[in-house]
Amino acid sequence: MQDKNVKIQGNLVRVHLSGSFLKFQAIYKVKKLYLQLLILSVIAFFWGLLGVVFVQFSGLYDIGIASISQGLARLADYLIRSNKVSVDADTIYNVIFWLSQILINIPLFVLGWYKISKKFTLLTLYFVVVSNVFGFAFSYIPGVENFFLFANLTELTKANGGLEQAINNQGVQLIFWEQTAEKQISLMFYALIWGFLQAVFYSVILIIDASSGGLDFLAFWYSEKKHKDIGGILFIVNTLSFLIGYTIGTYLTGSLLAQGFQEDRQKPFGVAFFLSPNLVFTIFMNIILGIFTSYFFPKYQFVKVEVYGKHMEQMRNYLLSSNQSFAVTMFEVEGGYSRQKNQVLVTNCLFTKTAELLEAVRRVDPDALFSITFIKKLDGYIYERKAPDKVVPPVKDPVKAQEN
């Protein structure tokens, strides 16, 4: 049986080469609202569940504004327990850690509504509410606080005893470097896995044209305005917010707890409380998140696209008559073997637009050669066509339209 991708022409063999340009390429084609909400619901489910496992009871901090919520939750938990207030400390902790994020996001929803887009804001609002409700519900699963993938950090802490045990007994998951390395290694794997999974989840959320809320609104707005890669911006924003949350929830709270405990090596408000494994591995987690987000969602990676074919005039007319925002250059080339004339269409565009451009090319010329070259550096200006007030419907069959 002859391979349909191979065609013999005389003493030449024509082979069809193909490959996916984008990670999660199928997600880019999801435009129906109910499918987008379904995908966000699935991600929100795992975001909440894994957030409880990897963050809430491990001593790591979540990304973005959630770090501040978690820090406030741990401080409130300490104040309630130390002052013996007659309220359920676990419930207060869970409410502040999960549900308070919805309230904190309200001003940022307003920013997104007016500065980014209404659909972006509504999809983000949906994800923030659903993921935090899931996380709040999962935090009440019996025994979830003792569920660990690699090592039971609670039992290890009890075995070590001393100041670390006293602090952890009050709900502050703090690890010191002087103790057994088993906890540090476990925490490192937690950071590695959760950082990678967050990058996968977050990239899919961005492709759908939403975000995880919080300070991501500011990062996304700045990224859109300045055309900067969002992975690096997310790392900066997440690190700053984490340092605030960590200072409140671990450094301050742990030091206050240690004031009533006689310990020579770890002084309250000392360097051991600040430069703990919790701090180092959460920063490591944010680095993993930033690197893989840029890899999975290269929003501002520019490429040079060259299209070789016989219907480039129809291709040009199609791009100009549709809502595609591609600036094109055309020239004629001659084949070195056949001496046949062919046209080449060249454009510089964002890598995330290549799948869309390829689909447009295939509508006009299924046999065209589509080539992509990554651009390392650019120096100059780019022009982006604004969406018209009234959308012009694209030509459904550009080849027949050209012939007519």
UniProtKB/Swiss-Prot annotation:
List the transmembrane segments: 37-57, 92-112, 122-142, 188-208, 230-250, 272-292
- Identify the domain of life: Bacteria
**Which InterPro entries is this protein grouped with?**
DUF2179 (IPR019264), N-reg_PII/ATP_PRibTrfase_C (IPR015867), UPF0750_membrane (IPR051461), YitT (IPR003740)
One family from Pfam that matches here is: DUF2179
Entry keywords, A to Z: Cell membrane, Membrane, Transmembrane, Transmembrane helix
Q: Give compartment(s).
A: Cell membrane
Kindly state one GO CC term assigned in the UniProt record: plasma membrane
| Bilayer topology | Multi-pass membrane protein
Q: What is this protein called?
A: Uncharacterized protein MG432 homolog
State the organism named in the record.
Answer: Mycoplasma pneumoniae (strain ATCC 29342 / M129 / Subtype 1)
